[in-house]
């Protein structure tokens, strides 16, 4: 199954810009990709089900709303059976379609990104390591999709259930390479603290988390194709250095913070949270990241709605220790606020559902 419309079908500007960047027709067509889905036929079905089309439509709406494109290696946490059942496949991984090659059209190039149903174990492996590596492991076993990565909604085993040695393989990959996940779209917000009263931000963050019913409870993660420098700010937008800031995340986004520190910052990389409502972006930056706006003397820099936060080597260990509760979040009442007065930083974790 595949959909059309994320790429430019007309070339006359009615849906997408008639040209895409300086390369014109040599650049991407529309958003530059289309979605595909391979589903194993259930013996009880006499015709193809409609739910894959609904999921693809929801993802397309997300792309049109945010302008964020999807690539092989990305993932989507969905939090319920993709077909509405009690299936363990409650999340999606994005891979290169093994059959549909990059196509050059009169209106630009088109990639084909395949949706693959995934268990929680597989989603977490992608977040902690990388999407292509996990997909290569899934291809080994017919039950997890085989070479064509066919989604079987009746699958009850993850790759780790099928082959426990995979856990060590993934752990070694994380140790050697860190995480390729460099950004997610989630519920987040930030505010400059002027009078040391952060209640305003707390209310704003809760408001943001209830705005979008279509994609209210999903998180979309991007691998290294996501460029933190491409956040939606004007080239001439003024940079403002801030003294104190307050960050807020929903629980699912917050659960990734230990990964951000261990798998990204400790490896000298950056990580970006983009608000699903489109009005906030937060990038955590390691000291070795080049081209950032922040430095040791000015660790917080804002450019329009985009905030950069420098996590210095001296701050990293303290931050990891303070956020250790996220490893057992069920034991903590939410919202929970953590403060680092010596670094002028406050962070709040809000519940996923308000």
Stretches found by the model and what they are:
Residues 1-39, 70-247:
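Aromatic/basic-lined ligand-recognition segments
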Residues 18-45, 318-324, 340-342, 350-354:
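Short acidic, glycine/tyrosine-flanked loop/strand segments centered on an H-E-D-like triad
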Residues 55, 77, 130-133, 291, ...:
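Generic alpha-helical propensity signal that fires on short helical segments
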Residues 45, 49, 130-131, 312:
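Short, structured coil/loop segments at alpha-helix boundaries
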């Amino acid at each position: 199954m595949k959909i059309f419309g994320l790429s430019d079908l007309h070339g006359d500007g009615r849906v997408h810009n008639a040209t895409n960047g300086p390369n014109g027709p040599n650049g991407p067509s529309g958003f530059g990709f289309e979605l595909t889905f391979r589903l194993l036929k259930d013996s009880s079905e006499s015709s193809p089900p409609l739910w894959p089309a609904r999921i693809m439509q929801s993802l397309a709406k997300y792309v049109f709303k945010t302008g964020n494109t999807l690539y092989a290696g990305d993932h989507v946490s969905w939090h319920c059976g993709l077909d509405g059942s009690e299936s363990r496949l409650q999340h999606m991984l994005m891979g290169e379609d093994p059959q549909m090659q990059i196509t050059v059209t009169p209106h630009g190039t088109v990639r084909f990104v395949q949706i693959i149903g995934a268990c929680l174990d597989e989603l977490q492996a992608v977040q902690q390591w990388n999407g292509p590596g996990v997909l290569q492991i899934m291809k080994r076993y017919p039950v997890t999709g085989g070479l064509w990565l066919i989604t079987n909604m009746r699958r009850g085993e993850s790759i780790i259930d099928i082959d426990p040695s995979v856990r060590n393989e993934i752990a070694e990959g994380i140790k050697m390479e860190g995480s390729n996940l460099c950004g997610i779209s989630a519920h987040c917000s930030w505010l400059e603290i002027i009078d040391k009263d952060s209640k305003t931000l707390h209310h704003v963050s809760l408001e943001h988390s209830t705005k979008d019913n279509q994609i209210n409870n999903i998180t979309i993660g991007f691998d290294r194709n996501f460029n933190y420098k491409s956040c939606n700010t004007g080239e001439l937008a003024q940079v403002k250095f801030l003294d104190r800031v307050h960050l807020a995340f929903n629980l699912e986004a917050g659960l990734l913070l230990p990964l951000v520190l261990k798998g990204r910052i400790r490896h000298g990389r950056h990580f970006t949270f983009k608000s699903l409502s489109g009005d906030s972006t937060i990038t955590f930056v390691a000291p070795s990241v080049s081209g950032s706006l922040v430095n040791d003397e000015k660790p917080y820099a804002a450019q329009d709605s985009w905030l950069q936060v420098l996590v210095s080597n001296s701050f990293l260990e303290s931050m990891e220790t303070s956020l250790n509760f996220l490893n057992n979040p069920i034991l903590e009442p939410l919202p929970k606020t953590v403060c680092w007065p010596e670094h002028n930083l406050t962070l709040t974790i809000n519940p996923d559902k308000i």
